[in-house]
């Protein structure tokens, strides 16, 4: 065997190993926080789920303008093409009516559909992975109570090669690690609740953090502001900076903005 053939063989073997490692990293599941939540009062669980759906603004991506609630169809433009929010009503055929709580948890926590298909990260499972199992079950319980709508989901309209879903394994290997958000014992209960809302169900980084050329955010950048891909709309920083961020804002200022869409220190949202 010539030296050239040996080198080529070694490179081929190395390529296979690297691709295999990327595929494994990109498709692995985290089951450490996966058991179903302990039974609780059904109505309280549904009400908790309704609160979470509002906090996460699920309706924004899962309700087309003028369409039925949570029936999907909302176009989500990205630099790679357009995706459409799916139907998450309890319709058995076109929604999530045939899903179990475990299936729903799989989507939020591991970024996979009911059949194991890798989900595109326009669905922010990079943040939703931090949602607790109890809250995932509550959100699922609430969605089971909304009016079922028979409306087929629109397939993604992505450019090549981004339409090759298998490539998501490499993206996930680089930018996604499923896992729970552990409370910081050195901080107050209120602080930890705020962190959970911001980094989990509220998925604030999805808009308020800069993205790289592959559409991924970096934890090191924090909530320093960023342009929302495809919309070319700038989401301002949510840091404590007194000039560019929220340093001069009171808790009431933030509450007013979230409730009314009107900011006391900047433009209307």
Residue ranges of predicted features:
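C-terminal capping alpha-helices of c-type cytochrome domains
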Residues: 20-24, 100-114, 127-153, 249-264
């Amino acid at each position: 065997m010539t030296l050239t053939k040996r080198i080529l063989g070694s490179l081929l073997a190395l390529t296979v190993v690297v691709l295999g490692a990327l595929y494994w990293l990109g498709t692995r599941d985290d089951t450490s926080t996966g058991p179903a939540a302990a039974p609780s009062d059904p109505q309280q669980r549904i009400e908790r789920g309704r609160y979470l759906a509002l906090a996460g603004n699920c309706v924004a991506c899962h309700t087309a303008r003028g369409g039925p609630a949570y029936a999907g169809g909302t176009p989500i433009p990205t630099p790679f093409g357009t995706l459409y929010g799916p139907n998450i009503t309890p319709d058995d055929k076109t929604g999530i009516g045939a899903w179990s709580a475990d299936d729903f948890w799989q989507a939020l926590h591991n970024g996979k559909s009911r059949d194991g298909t890798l989900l595109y990260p326009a669905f922010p499972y990079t943040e939703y992975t931090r949602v607790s199992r109890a809250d995932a079950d509550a959100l699922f319980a609430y969605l089971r109570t909304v009016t079922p709508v028979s409306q087929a989901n629109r397939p993604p309209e992505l450019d090549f090669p981004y339409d090759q879903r298998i490539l998501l394994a490499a993206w996930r290997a680089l930018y996604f690690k499923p896992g729970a958000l552990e409370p910081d014992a050195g901080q107050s209960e209120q602080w930890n609740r705020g962190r959970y809302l911001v980094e989990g169900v509220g998925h604030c980084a999805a808009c308020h953090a800069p993205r790289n050329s592959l559409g991924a955010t970096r934890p090191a950048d924090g909530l320093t502001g960023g342009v929302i891909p495809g919309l070319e709309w700038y989401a301002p920083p949510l840091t404590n900076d007194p000039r560019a961020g929220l340093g001069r804002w009171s808790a009431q200022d933030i509450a007013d903005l979230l409730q009314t869409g009107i900011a006391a220190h900047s433009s209307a949202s």
